[in-house]
């Protein structure tokens, strides 16, 4: 079979930079799915993307589908011929539909009888006759929330489309994509190189675009080039560029021919907290800030332009003029905000509604303050600092800086708290109260910070559930799922001795009569338990392990985590599968017992050697297990219990549990109940698969 390389390019207006990668990846996934469905073999496929183009390159694509034989089954032989052996009308109609006579049909014998069959040879379709429709279907399935129309065209896409190119080797594939006829014309850079040129071969795409059109179409190459050049530029001025991958991705999606330049700003702006300056540079201008070896912000920034200029100094000057007013704003806001303490802003929180039924932000910080102090008392943190940090926790939202640069909330609160003379614990808690802000973010570690972060999240969870606005489906306007994961992570990762029931009860009490949902506390607990399952699954923990622990309903997250780790370790032991099966068997036996389960073991009624051995082993282990359970050393406890395997196996091999003698039966049930209870101190091992 012959092969060729395929190139598909769609030339567009500037595509949304934050969607560029997703569009390209989806286009590739959709097209390769089409090729696979059509049984078209290929070696590999990659995507390219730049601000004004999406492209796919498929290597060693088969030039045609393979010929194949399709079995077309007809009527059963018993109904295909009449009593005289002549073909029935049904048989003749089937044969005619397949272009053969009944006599030319083959026979197929199955366990259900004999059938007429025609093995039709179907010739494969040439690839060039399939690609246009496949590419169109791939484009139709792109994740475009708001498609647009342009001109008089009824076609819709994320941006207007100007060119479409489909080449199979050197051959132009005829057809249309989004109403644009396929042609060899490829557009170059807007301001450099050839505005457009003819592409002779699919293999020339990257090199011709780069050399003739001044476009680097390979997204990853552009990204790597920007990163390398930015790092070199920063090193030249004795610093290190702050290159977050998300910003790097966005910048790479904005330029076709990246040129990295270095600019500066007045040193006087460094008196402003660096986070505000960085927010301005990165968020508004898409610049890379530069820091020295000590982590101090330098009065420089690195930016990427989309053109090779004969006068780069002019471009640098232009960017410096653009950023200067934003930095001046930050300086003005900071100096203005410093004239008022955070405490003096407390009354203004009364003017901001948190939620209609839950009151103002002032009401919320009062609740956070009380709950944070309650948590601090249980964890050994400074309760006075926790109460103070909770009270001030939202005051920075009323500052000019945070109103203008919203992502600096918490961070500016920390700086203002330090300027106000608050304790360092209070200042740090102002920033860390929002942690973890996103998946993979760190959690607060300082005691006061943990107390305030937990109080804030729990107040929101209990309050929103309390007014009957729990998340439904994908909708989660109050980000309760993130808050719940945050609560669990803070407690688990800091090994805090906190009980969810106690925390929820306290939070509910602080809401007073605001809550209309009488089941709020139970619903919040269930919601948190469900987040446990999702969180551990994301960490690769087996569902059966999670369910085994959930069955015991431990409400202390740190304790829950210890059980998860212990059961995960237990499952790696050789004895685990046999003991899990035995526990399942014990559970089934005990479930059939009517009334209360027997609990007292009478040694004189242990008549069989196997039950005597099991009882002796349990008696030997129990004094060793008790302190392990008390200290939550579940892993060591399960390791000891794994030593029961042989005794348990022998018991079920030799002993009839449901004996006719009632006393013997109850004694054996008590023995099994005791055995099961030892495991249930940790988890329901019977649920392990």
UniProtKB/Swiss-Prot annotation:
Keywords, sorted A to Z: Aminoacyl-tRNA synthetase, ATP-binding, Cytoplasm, Ligase, Nucleotide-binding, Protein biosynthesis
Localization (cell): Cytoplasm
Signal peptide range: none
MF annotations from Gene Ontology: arginine-tRNA ligase activity; ATP binding; glycine-tRNA ligase activity
Catalytic activity, reaction form: tRNA(Gly) + glycine + ATP = glycyl-tRNA(Gly) + AMP + diphosphate
GO biological process: arginyl-tRNA aminoacylation; glycyl-tRNA aminoacylation
Organism of origin: Shewanella baltica (strain OS155 / ATCC BAA-1091)
InterPro entries named in the record: DALR_anticod-bd (IPR008909), Gly-tRNA-synth_bsu (IPR015944), Gly-tRNA-synth_heterodimer (IPR006194)
Gene name of this polypeptide: glyS
CC annotations in GO: cytosol
EC number(s) given by UniProt: 6.1.1.14
Protein family according to the UniProt entry: Belongs to the class-II aminoacyl-tRNA synthetase family.
The name this protein goes by in its record: Glycine--tRNA ligase beta subunit
Subunit structure comment from the entry: Tetramer of two alpha and two beta subunits.
């Amino acid at each position: 079979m012959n092969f060729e390389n395929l190139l598909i390019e769609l030339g567009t207006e500037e595509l949304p930079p934050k969607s560029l990668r997703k569009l390209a990846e989806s286009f590739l996934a959709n097209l390769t799915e089409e090729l696979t469905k059509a049984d078209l073999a290929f070696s590999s496929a990659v995507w390219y993307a730049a601000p004004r183009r999406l492209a796919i390159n498929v290597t060693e694509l088969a030039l045609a589908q393979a010929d194949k034989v399709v079995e077309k089954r007809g009527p059963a032989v018993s109904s295909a011929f009449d009593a005289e052996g002549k073909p029935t009308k049904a048989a003749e109609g089937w044969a005619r539909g397949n272009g053969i006579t009944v006599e030319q049909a083959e026979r197929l014998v199955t366990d259900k009888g004999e059938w007429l069959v025609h093995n039709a040879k179907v010739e494969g379709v040439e690839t060039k006759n399939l690609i246009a429709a496949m590419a169109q279907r791939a484009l139709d399935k792109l994740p475009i929330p708001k498609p647009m129309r342009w001109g008089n065209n009824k076609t819709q896409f994320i941006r207007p489309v100007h060119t479409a190119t489909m080449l199979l080797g050197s051959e132009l594939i005829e057809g249309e994509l989004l109403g644009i006829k396929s042609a060899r014309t490829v557009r170059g850079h807007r301001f450099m190189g050839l505005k457009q040129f003819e592409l002779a071969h699919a293999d020339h795409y990257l090199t011709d675009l780069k050399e003739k059109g001044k476009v680097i179409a390979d997204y990853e190459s552009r990204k790597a080039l920007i990163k390398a050049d930015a790092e070199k530029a920063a090193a030249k001025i004795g610093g290190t560029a702050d290159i977050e991958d998300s910003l790097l991705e966005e910048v790479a999606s904005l330029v076709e021919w990246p040129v990295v330049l270095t600019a500066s700003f007045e040193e006087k702006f460094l008196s402003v907290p660096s986070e505000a300056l960085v927010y301005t540079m990165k968020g508004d201008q898409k610049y890379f800030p530069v820091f020295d070896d000590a982590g101090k912000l330098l009065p420089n920034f690195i930016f990427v332009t989309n053109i090779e200029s004969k006068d780069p100094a002019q471009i640098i000057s232009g960017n410096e003029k653009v950023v200067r007013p934003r930095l001046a704003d930050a300086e003005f806001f900071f100096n203005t905000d410093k004239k008022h303490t955070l405490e003096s802003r407390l009354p203004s929180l009364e003017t901001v509604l948190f939620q209609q039924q839950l009151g103002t932000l002032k009401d919320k910080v009062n609740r956070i303050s009380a709950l944070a102090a309650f948590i601090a008392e249980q964890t050994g943190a400074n309760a006075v600092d926790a109460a103070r940090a909770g009270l001030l926790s939202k005051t920075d939202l009323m500052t000019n800086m945070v109103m203008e640069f919203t992502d600096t909330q918490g961070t500016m609160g920390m700086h203002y708290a330090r300027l106000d003379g608050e304790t360092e614990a209070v200042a740090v808690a102002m920033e860390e109260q929002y942690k973890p802000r996103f998946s993979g973010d760190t959690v607060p570690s300082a005691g006061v910070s943990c107390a305030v972060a937990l109080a804030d999240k729990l107040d929101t969870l209990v309050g929103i559930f309390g007014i009957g606005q729990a998340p439904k489906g994908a909708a989660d306007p109050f980000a309760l799922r993130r808050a719940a994961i945050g609560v669990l992570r803070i407690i688990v990762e800091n090994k805090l001795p906190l009980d969810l029931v106690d925390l929820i009860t306290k939070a509910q009490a602080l809401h007073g009569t605001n809550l209309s949902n009488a089941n709020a506390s139970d619903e919040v607990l269930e919601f948190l338990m469900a987040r446990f399952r999702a969180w551990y699954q994301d960490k690769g923990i087996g569902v059966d392990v999670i369910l085994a622990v959930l069955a015991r309903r431990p409400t202390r997250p740190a304790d829950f985590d210890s059980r998860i780790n212990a059961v995960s370790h237990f499952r790696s032991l050789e004895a685990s599968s046999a003991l899990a099966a035995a526990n399942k068997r014990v559970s089934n036996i005990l479930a059939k017992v009517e009334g209360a389960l027997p609990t007292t073991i009478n040694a004189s009624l242990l008549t069989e050697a196997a039950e005597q051995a099991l009882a002796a082993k349990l008696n030997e282990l129990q004094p060793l297990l008790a302190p392990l359970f008390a200290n939550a050393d579940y892993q060591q406890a399960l390791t000891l219990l794994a030593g029961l395997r042989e005794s348990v196996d022998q018991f079920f091999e030799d002993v009839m549990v449901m004996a006719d003698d009632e006393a013997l039966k109850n004694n054996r049930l008590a023995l099994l109940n005791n055995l099961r209870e030892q495991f249930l101190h940790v988890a329901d091992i019977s649920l392990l698969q």
